[in-house]
Amino acid sequence: MVKIGVLLMNLGGPERITDVGPFLYNLFSDPEIIRTPFPVFQKPLAWLISTLRSTTSQQAYLSIGGGSPIRRITEQQARELQSKLREKGFNATTYIAMRYWHPFTESAIADMKADGIDQVVVIPLYPHFSISTSGSSFRELKKLRDSDDEFKKVPMRCVRSWFSQSGYLKSMVELISEQISLCESPSKAHIFFTAHGVPKSYVEEAGDPYKQQIEDCSLLIINELEKCLGYSNPHTLSYQSRVGPVEWLKPYTEEVLADLGRSNVNDLVVVPISFVGEHIETLQEIDIEYKEIAEKAGIKNFRRVKALNTHPTFIEGLSDLVISCLEGPLVNIEEASQLPEKVKLYPQEKWQWGWNNSSEVWNGRVAMIIFLVLFIELISGSGPLHKLGIL
């Protein structure tokens, strides 16, 4: 029987406080997260940002127990998916490839080679495609595969995004319905979708389909929820987790929460739409920071829908996703890692540092170059600012 390897790709996260700095360094070393004008600046900038952010991030992880549960939850998802696939008659073994912390993609490839896998199915644990999540993981996998003559021979099928998959939608509706049923007036409960944001330039310059997929997904969930409940709830979509001075996708979660409070919303059902497992953004950012903002805004009942984790309907849906990938049209790693052509938007390979598009982007890039020059002068101890006596 053919040996099938199911590779689950995820972000990764620090398991201990001492992991936080190295994890952040790995994150900001990725050019899909932060782009510098010249590649040589990438790692020095990553070191600087990770050093500056480390203490604050450590405090956030301490507030949820001292580390991220993302590896433990992903391993549980992998085990249950493997069991479900074997129940359905597939000789499948699951593997985990984290992008920025252990176990890394290299480790998963080594394990698949050692196990003699005949075919690989790649599932990003991000329902919606983005340059900075699935795209980065696919491109890392492609780079490693291209450099490994043995692994390159193994057939590989990829799922690019799966936000419209029936099992995913059904599991989301089940978990949302649980929280709605606890509200004082279920039909009046406000459904508040919050998705991880990305810089606006990813969408407008690079053609990232993430925003459109998030919007489509929220409407699909609302439609399925209405069929399930028999009534329609008011709903809102926002974006969280922005960092830095550039504009990210709007509306911002904290601003919408304040608006909903002013609108006298009493029952708020918060749906972390872009997260399939609990981690820092759900446990700390939503459960602590945003809950406090909501309460200060006057929202009486703040109910957060659990992440999918190992919800049985979700695991069943993942198994169906793997099977449909095996039986459906081939999507190889080259196709999975590329952005679609979009009118008036740049394909990913052309999304380079340059002077184009909006004045906001232009000014931001000038500021970044000035910052990098200043950083180099601080490190080297010499330069025009030293000669002028400013430094």
Swiss-Prot record:
Q: Where does Fe cation bind?
A: H196, E281
**UniProt GO MF annotations:** ferrochelatase activity; metal ion binding
Swiss-Prot/TrEMBL catalytic activity: heme b + 2 H(+) = protoporphyrin IX + Fe(2+)
Reply yes or no: does the keyword Magnesium apply: no
Which EC number(s) does the record attach to this protein? 4.98.1.1
Under NCBIfam families, the record lists:
hemH
Q: Which family does it belong to?
A: Belongs to the ferrochelatase family.
Q: What is this protein called?
A: Ferrochelatase
Annotated source species: Prochlorococcus marinus (strain MIT 9301)
Its ancestry begins with:
Bacteria, Bacillati, Cyanobacteriota, Cyanophyceae, Synechococcales
* Gene name for this UniProt entry: hemH
